[in-house]
Regions:
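Acidic interaction surfaces
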Residues: 1-136
Length: 136
């Protein structure tokens, strides 16, 4: 699992699972007493759900899917023949629903257990759909 920290806008992002056709990330951000949490599935163009965003929204998400967007990543300059434009379907959920209690969970302390469990279940579901095998 890797972690990234952005000092301009305090946020933490963990890669909970990285597969060949998708990754699952958890993001924690905010300031003292008002933290926000998100879980995202980043679905690549070689995953069966990439062309079916409606089905992707039905994945295991806390409170349902609250975010979906196709994201295009492009190289600033193409120097090599392997460089190309990449598209990702990013779908996710937040933990800011009525009766959620994660506002006090500081990302400095890591991912709260419930959120990590949700992210792991999402990864298992995406693995099953993709036919990939977990090599951990």
């Amino acid at each position: 699992m890797s972690m990234k920290f952005n000092t301009e806008n305090p946020s933490y992002e963990w890669v909970v699972f990285q597969g060949k056709s998708f990754s699952v990330t958890v993001k924690g951000w905010g300031c003292e007493g008002s933290y926000k949490w998100n879980v995202y599935a980043n679905i690549y163009d070689n995953h069966p759900l990439f062309c079916n965003p409606e089905a992707a929204k039905c994945l295991h998400f806390h409170g349902g899917c609250t975010y979906d967007k196709y994201i295009t990543t492009d190289e600033t300059e193409y120097k090599y023949d392997w460089q190309k434009q990449y598209k990702t379907l990013k779908v996710g959920s937040d933990y800011m629903h009525y009766m959620d209690y994660f506002e006090d969970e500081n990302p400095c302390n890591g991912i709260p257990f419930t959120i990590k469990w949700d992210a792991e279940q999402l990864a298992k579901e995406l693995l099953e759909i993709s036919g990939e095998h977990n090599v951990e």
